[in-house]
């Protein structure tokens, strides 16, 4: 089949850059949309919710079906049509008039509501597919304005698809939505800075008028206002748009951008006030609801039956940060310093690991000494400033709770680093980005649904084991989604708590555990809080440190060489078969952990145990135990009071 002559003539007039970009963008859009429309989302997500998905799912369907923001019995019953497990992790708040509302920003499910009305739950994915296609179009268009088309194509693909972005494309969560909104907003602001010179006739077209004229600044301000409402930590991203015109003495332009941004943010919070009676969508009396209860709360959901109400079930939450936590000596001097390193190369959150194309963009920008503009320096400052603000404001949960893959709180900011990329005349930079980033994330993005529901699996092996574990977020690491691997009581009075962050430790047996044969196991230890009895008979919690650790090792049918390292130097122990040895290990100071002002400071430690040999009891003694065992370990801490 041949193309019509007129169509062929028009295509020949288009540049290679235009044809390559248009065809690739169309192909990506077709693939993503067909995937979004046909995937069985309930099955691939293991018929359950993770993170905050239950809240956004329920609110999205409420807006699509009932056209309201209120949580009612019909909203709860609707969940069971698809999810037999119910809305696990549903996050609700009581409004000023006593009605129940969703304690999350409404803008993401509101944007998804038309697609949910048309396509059901897959409407979330349809929205994501459209946004991902738009992001690629923006990324390619910006890069291609100064780079060879092939180079632009390769880097744009790496930036979007060979990072953790695809993991959040498959989740019912606002993180990818915020990323797309911010990236698109910066595109409207930045494109005019790199666009080639065009004729007045071309300037008159609607496409170039919006992109190259002052209206594009207002579009950018609107989009960044939406992003700031959805994630207030992104508020610093408006700064380059305000400072850049001020440096050029364009005062009127700066005022228009600032007013537009402010009006959007105020309007969105005003709508929240009109609906719920409170401006803060996470403020007031709020609770998280699960089908099963816990130590201090009952399971169930409001309206599930007559006995289950907002007051009778659910886990109460306290909103907002606290200066009692943020501005302590430990937080500013010890925790912040560690968080800077974790932020860049952390095992579960590192920017250089999960969002490497952003780091490559920074490197290319700093290396291109002749092509660095002031607006790009401002963009870099906004990105870095947002990271620092995040670490200072949320020192113990800056990657997002719920066991995320990578740093989901910073994902929205990641997009701005694209606009640091200088002109690329060859594809070397993009190919290098593909190779290095692929080493870290290909095992994740190859199956993003599995990575979303099993966020700790990739970090248990390979290069991730060589990266530092984020001790400052011990209770927010992905392994916390596995209750039998976290907060495990071992020896000591009171018992020390262990977190088994890989699969080289078998589940606890009493106060001991087996390390897998021929393996190195990593675990975290958290010192408990000791009640201290006052003269008046009132118990007050007291922080404890681990001064030393008594290690008791026991081998099985094979001799073994065991190596223990607590950060104070390795200790190597040669052991005969069926023998036992004990010794003391001096412990480092420990990392302070105080995520809430009502709780005393805990101290967290990292420990590795390596077993050089192993045996299978089934083949040694006829036991039914088929595990590959290395060495059995008991840990008994000696505590000292925190100074």
Give short role names for the model-derived ranges.
Residues 1-44, 141-144, 214-216, 253-260, ...:
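Start-transfer (signal-anchor) and selected internal transmembrane alpha helices
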Residues 4-6, 193-196, 236-270, 363-373:
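Perimembrane helix-loop-helix junctions
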Residues 60, 155-160, 207-231, 238-245, ...:
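Membrane-interface alpha helices of multi-pass inner-membrane proteins
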Residues 65-108, 112-116, 287-334:
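Interfacial juxtamembrane loops and adjacent helix segments
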Residues 123-147, 180, 184-187, 366:
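Transmembrane-helix motifs of polytopic, lipid-linked glycan transferases
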Residues 138-141, 158, 177-209, 216-224, ...:
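Specific aromatic-rich, kink-prone transmembrane helix
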Residues 242-245, 343, 350-383, 417-422, ...:
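Hydrophobic, aromatic-rich transmembrane alpha-helices
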Residues 254-364, 380-393, 442-451:
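Membrane-lumen/periplasm interface segments of specific transmembrane helices
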């Amino acid at each position: 089949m041949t193309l019509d002559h007129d169509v062929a003539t028009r295509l020949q007039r288009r540049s290679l850059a235009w044809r390559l970009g248009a065809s690739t963008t169309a192909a990506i859009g077709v693939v993503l949309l067909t995937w979004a429309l046909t995937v069985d989302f309930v099955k691939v997500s293991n018929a359950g919710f993770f993170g905050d998905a239950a809240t956004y799912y329920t609110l999205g369907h409420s807006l699509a079906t009932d056209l309201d923001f209120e949580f009612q019995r019909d909203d709860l019953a609707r969940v069971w049509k698809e999810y037999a497990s119910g809305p696990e992790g549903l996050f609700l708040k009581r409004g000023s008039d006593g009605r129940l509302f969703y304690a999350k920003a409404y803008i993401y499910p509101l944007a998804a509501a038309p697609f949910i009305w048309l396509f059901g739950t897959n409407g979330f994915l349809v929205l994501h597919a459209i946004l991902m296609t738009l992001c690629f179009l923006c990324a390619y268009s910006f890069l291609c304005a100064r780079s060879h088309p092939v180079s632009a194509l390769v880097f744009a693909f790496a930036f979007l698809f060979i990072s953790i972005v695809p993991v959040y494309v498959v989740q019912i969560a606002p993180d990818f939505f915020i990323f797309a909104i911010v990236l698109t907003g910066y595109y409207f602001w930045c494109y005019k800075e790199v666009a080639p010179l065009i004729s007045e006739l071309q300037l008159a077209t609607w496409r170039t008028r919006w992109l190259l004229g002052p209206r594009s600044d207002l579009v950018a301000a609107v989009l960044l206002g939406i992003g700031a409402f959805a994630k207030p930590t992104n508020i610093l991203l408006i700064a380059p748009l305000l400072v850049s015109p001020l440096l050029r003495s364009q005062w009127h332009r700066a005022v228009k951008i600032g007013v537009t941004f402010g009006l959007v943010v105020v309007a969105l919070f005003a709508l929240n006030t009109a609906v719920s009676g409170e401006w803060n969508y996470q403020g007031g009396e709020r609770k998280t609801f699960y089908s099963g209860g816990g130590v201090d709360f009952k399971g169930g959901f409001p309206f599930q039956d007559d006995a289950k109400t907002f007051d009778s079930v659910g886990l109460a939450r306290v909103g907002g940060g606290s200066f009692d936590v943020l501005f302590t000596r430990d937080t500013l001097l010890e925790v912040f310093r560690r968080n800077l390193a974790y932020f860049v190369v952390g095992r579960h959150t590192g920017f250089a690991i999960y969002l490497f194309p952003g780091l490559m963009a920074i490197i290319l920008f700093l290396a291109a000494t002749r092509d660095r503009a002031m607006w790009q320096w401002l963009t870099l400052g906004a990105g870095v400033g947002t990271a620092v603000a995040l670490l200072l404001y949320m020192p113990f949960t800056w990657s997002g709770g719920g066991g995320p893959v990578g740093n989901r709180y910073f994902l929205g900011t990641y997009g701005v680093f694209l606009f640091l990329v200088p002109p690329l005349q060859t594809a070397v930079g993009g190919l290098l980005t593909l190779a290095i980033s692929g080493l870290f994330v290909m095992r994740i993005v190859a199956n993003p649904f599995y990575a979303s529901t099993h966020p700790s699996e990739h970090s248990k092996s390979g290069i991730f084991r060589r990266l530092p574990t984020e001790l400052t977020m011990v209770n927010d690491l992905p392994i916390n989604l596995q209750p039998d691997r976290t907060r495990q009581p071992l020896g000591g009075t009171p018992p020390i708590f262990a977190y088994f962050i890989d699969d080289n430790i078998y589940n606890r047996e009493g106060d001991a555990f087996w390390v897998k044969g021929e393996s190195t196991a990593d675990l975290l230890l958290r010192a408990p809080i000791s009640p201290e009895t006052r003269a008046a008979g009132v118990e007050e919690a007291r922080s404890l440190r681990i001064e030393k650790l008594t290690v008791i090792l026991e081998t099985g049918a094979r001799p073994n060489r065991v190596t223990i390292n607590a950060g104070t130097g390795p200790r190597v122990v040669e052991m005969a078969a069926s023998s036992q040895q004990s010794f003391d290990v001096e412990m480092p100071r420990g990392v302070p952990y105080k995520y809430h002002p009502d709780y005393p400071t805990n101290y967290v430690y990292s420990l590795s145990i390596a077993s050089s040999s192993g045996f299978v009891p089934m083949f040694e003694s006829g036991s039914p135990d088929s595990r590959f065992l290395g060495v059995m370990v008991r840990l008994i801490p000696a505590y000292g009071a925190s100074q």
